Structures are given as structure tokens and as C-alpha cells.
Amino acid sequence: MTQAALAMSMTDPIDTTADAGLMARIDSACQRIAPLWPLKHFVAVNPFLGFTGQSFAATAATFERVVRTRMLMPRAFYRQALDDGRIDDAALAQALGAHPSTGLELNELKQKARAEAGTSSPPAVVATVAEVLDRLAEGDRYVSLVAFMIDEISAFCATYFDEGQASWPSPVRKLKPYAAWRTIAAYDRNPEVMGLTGFRKAIAELPADPVQAIGVIVDRLGIPERAVEDYLVRALFDLGGWSAYARYIGWSAGLDGQRDDTLLELLAIRLAWGYALYQARTDDAFKAAWAQAMAEAAKLPADQRLEETPELAIDLVLHEAYEIALRSKLVARLAGHGAQAVTRLPARPPVQAAFCIDVRSEIFRRALETAYPDAETIGFAGFFGFPIEYVPIGHSKGGAQCPVLLKPAFIVCEAVKDADDVEQSEVLGLRLLRRRAAKALKSFKVSAVSSFSFVETAGLGFAAKIATDSAGVTRPVPSPVVDGLDPEIAARVQPRLTPGELAGRATGFTDPQRVAMAEAVLKAMSLTGPFARLVLLAGHGSTTVNNPHASGLDCGACGGHTGEANARVAAAVLNDWQVREGLRAKGIDIPADCWFIGALHDTTTDDVTLFDEDDVPATLAQDLARLKARLTEAARLARLERSALLGISNKAAVDEAVIARSRDWSQVRPEWGLAGNTAFIAAPRSFTRGLNLGGRAFLHSYEAARDDGHRTLELIMTAPMVVASWINLQYYGSTVNNAAFGSGNKVLHNIVGQLGVLEGNAGDLRVGLPWQSVHDGSRLIHEPVRLNVFIAAPEAAMDEIMQRHQGVRDLVVNGWVMLHSLSDQGTIRRCVRPGEWRSA
């Protein structure tokens, strides 16, 4: 490693002054990539996030032309829907009306739908050097240069970005990515073994600055001016997984008000590989093929006209018709239900139970309302309005317990209830000691020197553990929540709200902050009175084993963590008598006999755990006992409803079977997560109570009459609605094209760097959901449709919010979500654009 390379620190700025135009194209290309959160807090992300500024149809054309991949189902899927009657003539006619540029008549469309899709490519596409070389290759022993390049870059990224899985850290970790890769490339002979002569020389000739290197490569490859940005986008999507992770690093830096160029540097690495391949081939055949590819790229259309890709246009219309047919049924059910009489609750219900808006909560809320008819259920984002960083005992930093669109505003540390300073120190010291011992044992097990001798000498000692893990009696890996803590101590752990300090950072809440947060949360929940005697705040999480994507089943509103911390913090704040005094001065009067209690809904087993029961006043003991009994009954009803999709045929043994799935380390489908999501409804519960939405709708409580200035409506449309669209589109992408937007076969997953998975032992980092999350082995469980949003609010207010927030406007106008207004009379109208609403 050279001294010059070592001198280039991680904080050295990138020179962006050489070519402002090129830098603008680079930034634009990088913005096209959606971020990928690491496994420890894996959250759903819209894979088309960088394309929402253009229409859904235009994006489909862009992906076919630039990325060379589809974002629609195969033609056979829509043909089957026609045969099954799920798409009717009315839906086809309406879809054709939305795409007049196709020039198709109804009968002509039906004929084409029943024919196999043509294989013709778009009129102009973007090709890379490696792709052109692969086209020229002959013989069955040829190794794809595209695959080889991706494997090599992926291997570098796995070592460079490793978050603690590797025993030996990368020696160039302190350098920026491009400098680190060039340092290693100077010694790497793998490319030359593959026949890429002069690889190291070509890389050494490139500028050390990544932006300058990109400029040189673009110039020497002769990429047409019109195609430069598309070429950069294509290069990034060649490494879609690692590009997405690099984008996450930049996203996180952006929340802190900083700029990070990791993705730009990865782009430079990818282009440098292409440049080295280009330099290695000087034969006439390649020169002619490359010239032809660049001539095609120069003809790229300035827009994405559907008539230029007729086969895509047909599939877009068929997909639109498929969605219209499904949406029509949903609209009819909502409109019909809204006109029915709704069972009235007591003026003061005995229990108010707030759950996350997650679609899995819809099933449990219906079950609880069946088991406890007088109870009122509420839907709200599962972080309960408290954007906190929750720091466990023994840690200096914690996870962000809030939507990834936000940055934590408060730091809350974990503490042991009723423990003095001496006991707190003992617990901390013991947990740190156990963590160090576990780390040392792991290092010994995987060490190159001791791994074989360890297995030979201690292998039999693990036989009992393997047996109990296989039987579901014990967990293969301890829960990180209680890892290193004695059971008695783990039962006493709780969040500490009092102000303090951690490594120079303020923790806890001041009294004014508690009052302000409590007021904001209650108003956002439309919960300002009357209050029940017991108010349940139920976050949610999941229980699975041997599941790399386990955090993806936890609460997305809590940043891929369980909602326990947020529920307990919110309940503790709202039970504070000083907070209640402050709220009373603001017009919110919480009665003295009202108590908030935090809880956690396990979406895998449907069990509900209540926290801090010892703090509940004795006068509410009977109320609490009644609630626990009703929750147990609701859990049984919810498991019974979910058992059909889980394939549990023995209804008498549903409870045991569901719990067994949560402990089975060979189970690839412990639960269905948010598969099937189709709708987001923000309205009073009276609009949907008694309506079976099949666990397919996000339900957010909202009462426009209580929303002065429509501030809560603005929060709903800019946060929960956007997050719901991210979830919906991740499931959509993982269903329509799992190879591009999903993570493939879960059985083949290998964790890399503790941050993501590979499918097998090589290739790109995988994004999105495993195939098993959307398909049961014989049929799709998730229907690939865009999110239908229904909000019971004035249309003019929604228009104003869309005008103020371009991101929300883009989602609606460009067809990424279908926004509807709901009225008390059951009238439903769809928004075409701000100011234009049509009957649905």
C-alpha cells in the first residue's frame, strides 16, 4: 500500500469543480437508487424511489430501456386473470381510456392479451462494455464477464463494508472506497487470470479522484452526450444491491445534514472495471460491436413514449385493468359499508386500544372488537409519535425507533427498575463481561487456527443444544433484548425518562418536552377525550428464528425494531401527573382514573404482552384482568383467521401450530408479514368497523373535525401514507420481478458482513423480499397492485397539502398511489391531480 493512498483519509473532499455538468449527471444517476437498510434494522423501501418524479408507465419504459428489466407481471398472469374473470371488459375499457396513445381497441387488446408477448427489444437500449463482450463470446465454457465483474466488486464490498462478521478487518478500511479498491487492484491478479490483460495497468492510469476518473472513462468510451446519465444509471443497477447499500450510507449522512459520496465512489469502481475491459480488447469485432452499441445509445428517446414499445404498452394496459377491477370491488365495499348503520360504543368505552397501522393489526383489531364489543380500537403509527433513539444497557448508541424518514429527536436509555447505582453498575459490568466472553468464544470457533480443533474437542458438547433448538425449546441465538442479562434483571428493564447524559449527549425528556410530545401525540391520534379507564398502547414485533430478515417483520414505523420501547415511553409520559396538569392547561383533560399501559403485539403468534403491570392502580385491577382475558380470546380468533393462509388444516391445533412455526428454524414462512396489502385508510373507525378487510389495509384513525388547520392530515399524508407506499411498492417489486427487486430464494441466503444477504456464495447483494415472502410455493399470496389510499378529509385540504409537498404530489399525479376522498355519505372520489377529483 502506498503512502499516498494511506494519506487519503475518509474525510478528504471529492473534487467536484472539474466538470459541473458531469457532476450534475452523476448526482442525478445516484438519486435514482433506492437505499437498502442493513439486516439489523431492515425496513421496506420503495425500489422505484428515484423514479417517482415520472409516471409509473414512463418508469416501466425506462427500466426496459436502461436497466433491461421488467416491472410488470408476465403476460400469462394477466391472461389468467382474464380467464378467471378477475379482469372484465369494463376494466379493460377504462384502462384503455387511461392510455390513449396505444391506439388499441377493446377487442384488439383482448386478442393481444391471449397471445404470447413479443420478444422484440425496445428501439434503443443502453449496453455496457461487459455486456457487449458477453454478446460476442462463443462456446459453452465461456464465463460471463458481467458475472465475473459483479463477483469481484461484490467481494471487495463485502470486506470493505463489513459490520463485524469478519474476524479480520479489511486493511484498507480507513480509505475511501475508490482509493481502497485501487490500492487492492494494484495487487489483484484475478482479472488477468481470466484473460483481462493489462487490467492493473489500466486501473493505475485512471485519476485518483473518482469524479475525474468517471469523466475520463465517459470520454474514452465515447458515450454519446444524450446517453451519459442513462449509462451511469445502468452501471449502478449492475450492482443494484451494493449501490442500494451505499445509498443508505448517504441517506443516513443526509439525516445528519452531511454529504456522503460512497455511492459516487462505487460508481467510479464499476466504471473503472468497464474501462479496463474496454482497454483489454482491441480487436475489430469488439470495436464494431461497441460502435454499434453507442450508435444505438445515441438514439435514446427524449421521453418514454409507449408507442415506441408496443408490447410494454399492452402489458401496462392489462396491468391497469387488473388494478381497476380490484379497486372497483374495494370501493364498492367501502361505499356500501359507509352507508350502513354502525354499532354505537358507550360514551366512555371501558378500553381504548391503539395499534400500529400495520395491515396485520387490522386482523387483530377486528378480533378484539369481536371479543370485546365495547372496546374502541385506534390505528396510529407504531412509534406512537415518539422519535427516539433507544440505548440498551451496555451500549453507547442505540437504534432509531422512528420512521426512516425522520431523525430521532430524543435519546432514551435503558435502566433497571428500582435499582440503585451499585446494582446498575453490577448489571452493566456483568453484561459487558458476558458480551466480551461471547465474542472471544466466537472468534475462537471461526479462527483459521482453532476452528477445526474446536469442533473436534467440543463438538459433542453442543449436541443437546442442537436438539433443543431443533425442537423449538430453545433459541439458536439469544434475543438481543435480553442477551447477557439474568432473567430476573431482564424482567425489570425499562426506559428511563429522566434527563441525563450519555457520552456528552443529553438523554431523557424535560418537563416541557413531555407535555409538548404528549399533546402532539394525542391530537395526532384524534384521542383528546373522552378517555377510557384503560388505554392500551400496543406496539408490535415478531418472533422468528434463523431468519436474516427478522427485523423486516418488526415495526417499520420503529425503524425495523419492535415497538416495545415506544409504547412504554408513551405510556409513561401520559401517566405522569405533571404532564396531565400541563395537558389540562391546553384543553386536554385526562381523568384521574384513566391509565395508559404499554404492550407488544407479536404478529407471528398474536400474543399480546403487557408491560409495567405492577404500576397499574389497584382500582383498575378488574379492568386489567378483563382486558387480558379479552386479549387472549382475540389472539385465538386472530390465529384462527390467519391459519388458512398459513396452511394449518387442523383447526383444533391452530394455537400450537402457530407457536411452533415461530420456533422452527427450518420454517421459511413463519408469518406472511404485510403480503396482500392493497389499501391505506385514514378515517374514523366507524367507516370500517365490522368490515372484514382481510389483513390487507393500513388503518389510521383520523377525525377531520378535530384537526384544526389540517395539521394532522398533513402529517398523515407526508409520513404514514408515504411509508405505506414504500411497503406496498417493495412487495409489488418483489412480486413482479423478484430477480431484480427481491432477494431470491431464502433457502440459499448467506449473510454477508452482517448487513445483507447473497443468494448462494457470490453475486450482488440482494435487495427486497425473499420469494417465500410473497409466494407459498404454488401461488402468489401478494397481489401486485399499487396502494389505494382513502382519506376522510376535505378534498381542498388534500389539494393544498399536495401543492406544498412535491413528493406527495408526485406519488399521486404520477400514479404510484391512488388517492381517494371518503365522505360521511359513502361517496368516494379519486384524485387525478390537485384540484381534479372524479367519482370512483
From Swiss-Prot:
Name where it's found.
Cell inner membrane
Q: Which residues bind Zn(2+)?
A: 356, 358, 540, 555
- Decide whether keyword Membrane is in the record: yes
**InterPro entries cross-referenced by the UniProt entry:** DabA
Which keywords has UniProt assigned to this entry?
Answer: Cell inner membrane, Cell membrane, Membrane, Metal-binding, Transport, Zinc
Instruction: Give the record's membrane topology.
Output: Peripheral membrane protein
Which GO cellular component terms are attached? Answer: plasma membrane
**Which cofactors does it use?**
Zn(2+)
Tell me a Gene Ontology molecular-function term this record carries: zinc ion binding
The protein's job, in short, is: Part of an energy-coupled inorganic carbon pump.
Sequence similarity: Belongs to the inorganic carbon transporter (TC 9.A.2) DabA family.
- Please describe the quaternary structure of this protein: Forms a complex with DabB.
Q: What is this protein called?
A: Probable inorganic carbon transporter subunit DabA 2
